[in-house]
Amino acid sequence: MNTPTRTAVAIGAFASLAITPLVQAADWSDTALSVRYGTQFAEPYDNHADGSRVDIAKTIVALTNVTGYKYGSTFINVDFLQSDGKDPGGGVAGHPGAQEVYGVFRTTVDLGKVTGASLKMGPIRGVGVTAGFDLNTKNDGYASKKRMAVVGPTLMLEVPGFLNLSALLFDESNAPQAIARRYHYKNHAAFEADWGIGIGELPLSFNGYAQWITAKGEDEFGAQTAPESHIDMDLMLDAGSLAGLSKKTWLVGVEYEYWHNKFGNKTATGPFLAGDGATASTPMVRVEYHF
């Protein structure tokens, strides 16, 4: 069993164990299984001889849970990513496409609910503290094993749905196969917006997140990292309700991701630079089943 498969099993088991008690203690909960597909993904350092990026097709299967409880909310997402042969396993041309598992856990504690005091101020409906972690593994030539802790304040805005603005501190490390021990980057900041908003009375929703992440000092090979921009958003149609099924069960739609200086790798051409592969503009199709 290869590393991504072992990690997928471990993360899947963790997600199941984490989701079950959260759902049991929840005021409300939503779990979804989704599939998305696009043909214009990119990876740092994966470039053609002329310096242009290699377009990679990926199929991504995700398990997601969002839960609200007495004092706040939690978010769990596990992505299982399968690349085509343009992003080969082991970084070896001709091998089957690489596999990646990326897990995210966040919890936001609403300080107003904890203290019993109203913290509403104009368009701000609440103030919270967000904490959590990211982790991943991938079996390409780099063989990422990212681990990252996250903490910071969050403003929750008054909108139909939700819109949260956070200022976060990231404590990140990685242990790719080319180095002997885990490398810790300089602690760095991120400014993030997360939203899920219905569109009037239409069976449509607009969801996503946007991040701007500061540089994190030198990477494990001594190169300077760069600030990172990452936007991922989707427009989803409640197809199930239109077909006479339960509302918000089967959703179909389109998704768009823009990622500049992916994972802090600078989009620039030259020796030891990531080239155009460090930036991608990726349209996708997406299907979700909620249960």
List each language-model region with its residue ranges.
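Short loop/turn motifs that connect adjacent beta-strands in outer-membrane beta-barrel proteins
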Residues: 23-30, 66-75, 111-128, 156-165, ...
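Outer-membrane beta-barrel transmembrane domain signature
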Residues: 172-249, 291
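Surface-exposed loop and membrane-interface regions of Gram-negative outer-membrane beta-barrel proteins
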Residues: 77-142, 224-228, 269, 274
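Residues on the lipid-exposed face of transmembrane beta-strands in outer-membrane beta-barrel proteins
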Residues: 63-67, 105-113, 151-157, 191-197, ...
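Short glycine/proline- and aromatic-enriched beta-strand/turn motifs that initiate or cap beta-hairpins
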Residues: 25-77
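Outer-membrane beta-barrel "beta-signal"
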Residues: 277-291
